[in-house]
Swiss-Prot record:
Keywords: Ribonucleoprotein, Ribosomal protein, RNA-binding, rRNA-binding. Transmembrane segments: none annotated. Residues 21-31 have a biased composition (Gly residues). Binds to the 23S rRNA. This is Large ribosomal subunit protein uL15. The gene is rplO. GO terms for biological process: translation. Part of the 50S ribosomal subunit. PROSITE patterns: RIBOSOMAL_L15. Residues 1-57 are annotated as: Disordered. InterPro entries: Ribosomal_uL15, Ribosomal_uL15/eL18, Ribosomal_uL15/eL18_sf, Ribosomal_uL15_bac-type, Ribosomal_uL15_CS. Belongs to the universal ribosomal protein uL15 family.
Amino acid sequence: MFLNTLRPGEGSKHAPKRVGRGIGSGLGKTGGRGHKGLKSRSGGSVKPGFEGGQMPLQRRLPKFGFTSRQAKYVAEVRLNELATVNAEVVDLAALKSADILGHQIKTARVILSGSIDKAITVRGLKVTKGARAAIEAAGGKVEE
């Protein structure tokens, strides 16, 4: 038995009611939509948030905040991600070639998350105080 072969037991599910197939079915002619009106027509429905012409809530409330465009180009790198890089000197190019950073990233900051036990040299990256202490405790160094 596999997840993609699971089926309900035979007879446990009713077949869906076919709509608009004659008056004997009970759902013929108007097909359960009633007579006239917006919701009886094909494609006819009110959009989400429509309040009958009253100014909708999402337009009554003020706009707020913004999306930082800098966030596209700045990334955080954890210490345990640095440990996976097979290079003595870890810089932006080494992180990109190890598929830790995307190609759009222009600067990165090393943060204290996880642990590192091999000595590496971090060059050209911003490093937090805690991460700097952990790198130096493991025998590595940080170059600006």
